[in-house]
C-alpha cells in the first residue's frame, strides 16, 4: 500500500475523534451482465464499491459521477437509488447514499489512491470485500431494488 494515503487516513482519525463530524458519502454498484466492479484503495485492505465524499454545494448524483470519473475513469449512464445507510465507525456520523448503474464505460485511467480495479463475477466474489460493500451486494441480489434505509 502506498504510504502517503495511509498516513493521511491515520492522521484523520484523531480529528474525527475530537470533532465527531457528520459526513455524506456516495457509492455505486457498477453491474455489467453477471459482473460487478470493485476497487481496492492504497490505504485500505478490502475491496470496496467505488465512490467517495460529497463536496459542499454538490448534488448526490454529481458527487458519484465525479468520484468514479476521478478514481477509476468511469462515465456513468442512468442511475437508480438503492438506499441510504448510516455508519458510525471511526468516530464519524457517516451517511452513505448507494446507487446502481448498469450503463457505464471505463477509460482505463486510475487515481493514485486506487491500487486496483477489477470486474468480478458476482457468483465468484473475493473473500476480502468490506463488510458494508458485501451487504449492499447481497441486498441487491435478493430484493426488488426499491430504495432502503439502514445501517452500513
Question: Where do the PLM segments sit?
Answer:
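Conserved Nudix-box catalytic region and its N-terminal flanking loop in Nudix hydrolases
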Residues: 31-70
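Unchanged
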Residues: 54-77, 86-140, 148-151
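Residues embedded in well-ordered beta-strands
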Residues: 27-29, 35-37, 96-100
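Acidic, metal-coordinating catalytic segment for phosphate/diphosphate chemistry
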Residues: 1-27
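Short secondary-structure boundary/capping segments
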Residues: 20, 28, 39, 89, ...
